[in-house]
């Protein structure tokens, strides 16, 4: 038994976070999405084939020493069907296929009982997904792609069990106008010829497609951690709840950490810093004097040195915040924060701060309005109020007129 994990997509709805990394490499609860998936499947299979393309070197470099993992590069044709077809000459007769951008709780042993199976999940908004219709024996009888009037509340959850017949059906599938070959089109042919079991997922499941999905999945996974403190803790530090502090991390004097939270190797907190629940500080980050971070993911090598507030935000790698940088995360009317996703204004959640790419620098007293996205490699000058998205490689600054008058 082998597994194929689909990791080739660009993750455009998650930009700017995916400008410098593939979506499966976005860290949630201290490790990439892809690592969470691999940990669910690695004991069940002999080989794990990662189908890579976009920013493939990030995936290869991170997982190159895993004994079961092999890398296959998807060709010019895009789409999930083409991604699966990439492994045609490598996998065993039976194999699992898993989307590389989902966080899920259920174990996968149930899938091994069937020749063909698709994971399904009951949701409140099936019209936003691919809908699955089952018969009385839980066999799939119909697939609908984002229908206006869904026939079911069950959706395709992105986990499959196939044999090599699926390759034959994928090859018969027409390439779409977008130049893609889709796996679901092949499954529509499969259900006409074979019984395909719909396996209902009962536990947590998250299709990580939007920035707030990352923060939601982060909360779910952090709720499962247990305290493990190996780093250096200075005097008068207060630690509450479940907190992981890795070896090589330092929490300086008079800081407060409220779990669940993870502080990775090389991170420095304090003195007098406040880390609130559902925060992850990745490797070599710095949250300094009188800075507060709440329910946020701070990626590697980012510095928030002093008198700053970051809430409900995702901050990329190698960012540096000037003194008194503030992220707002709540509207006055308490309605969901609106975010631009692929040129559309979308309602997110009640609290959402800033979504920031890599290598961003802010001057002193910079403020961000809720839901703002900042692209990679930006500079933001002192005293700016950022109330709209900033494209990558942009320098934003303001000019206030200074008036000089002679005193008598």
From Swiss-Prot:
Entry EC no(s): 2.7.7.23, 2.3.1.157
pH dependence: Optimum pH is 7.5.
InterPro entries reported for this sequence: Bifunctiontional_GlmU_arc-type, GlmU-like, NTP_transferase_dom, Nucleotide-diphossugar_trans, Trimer_LpxA-like_sf
Catalyzed chemical reaction(s): N-acetyl-alpha-D-glucosamine 1-phosphate + UTP + H(+) = UDP-N-acetyl-alpha-D-glucosamine + diphosphate; alpha-D-glucosamine 1-phosphate + acetyl-CoA = N-acetyl-alpha-D-glucosamine 1-phosphate + CoA + H(+)
Residue numbers spanned by region N-acetyltransferase: 223-408
Annotated GO MF terms: glucosamine-1-phosphate N-acetyltransferase activity; UDP-N-acetylglucosamine diphosphorylase activity
Residues binding UTP, per UniProt: 6-9, 74, 79
Superkingdom in the source lineage: Archaea
Biochemical pathway: Nucleotide-sugar biosynthesis; UDP-N-acetyl-alpha-D-glucosamine biosynthesis; N-acetyl-alpha-D-glucosamine 1-phosphate from alpha-D-glucosamine 6-phosphate (route II): step 2/2; Nucleotide-sugar biosynthesis; UDP-N-acetyl-alpha-D-glucosamine biosynthesis; UDP-N-acetyl-alpha-D-glucosamine from N-acetyl-alpha-D-glucosamine 1-phosphate: step 1/1
GO biological process terms on file: UDP-N-acetylglucosamine biosynthetic process
Function: Catalyzes the last two sequential reactions in the de novo biosynthetic pathway for UDP-N-acetyl-glucosamine (UDP-GlcNAc). Responsible for the acetylation of GlcN-1-P to GlcNAc-1-P, and for the uridyl transfer from UTP to GlcNAc-1-P, to produce UDP-GlcNAc and pyrophosphate. Also catalyzes the reverse reaction, i.e. the cleavage of UDP-GlcNAc with pyrophosphate to form UTP and GlcNAc-1-P. To a lesser extent, is also able to use dUTP or dTTP as the nucleotide substrate, but not CTP, ATP or GTP.
Protein name as annotated: Bifunctional protein GlmU
Source species of the chain: Methanocaldococcus jannaschii (strain ATCC 43067 / DSM 2661 / JAL-1 / JCM 10045 / NBRC 100440)
